[in-house]
Regions:
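Domain-length accessory/inserted modules outside core catalytic folds
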Residues: 1-82
C-alpha cells in the first residue's frame, strides 16, 4: 500500500509497505492509533504511546483557526481510505 511517511526532522516521503497490522506497527515502531484530522478521506497512523515513550516530537496538528491542538510524537504515516 502507498503511504506518506513522516519522520521527525525529515522531509515526508512516499513509500510502499505491505498491507496489514504488522507493517503499520513496524512503520510507527509500536502500537498504532488512527486519527482523522483532515477533511480528506485519509487516516493519520501514529504510535499510540509515542508521547508516553518519549519519542521525538514530529508535527503539530492545528484546528481551523491555526491553533495547535496536538503534537504527534515519533514516526507517523498518512494513507488513503477506501
Amino acid at each position: 500500500m502507498k503511504i506518506l511517511m513522516v519522520q521527525p526532522g525529515k522531509i515526508p516521503h512516499e513509500t510502499d509497505i505491505e498491507p496489514g497490522l504488522r507493517s503499520l506497527q513496524a512503520a510507527v515502531d509500536g502500537s498504532i492509533q488512527a486519527v482523522y484530522p483532515y477533511e480528506d478521506p485519509v487516516a493519520l497512523i501514529c504510535n499510540e504511546e509515542g508521547k508516553f515513550l518519549g519519542l521525538p516530537l514530529n508535527r503539530a496538528l492545528r484546528d481551523d483557526t491555526g491553533e495547535i491542538y496536538d503534537i504527534i510524537a515519533g514516526n507517523f504515516l498518512i494513507t488513503g481510505l477506501g
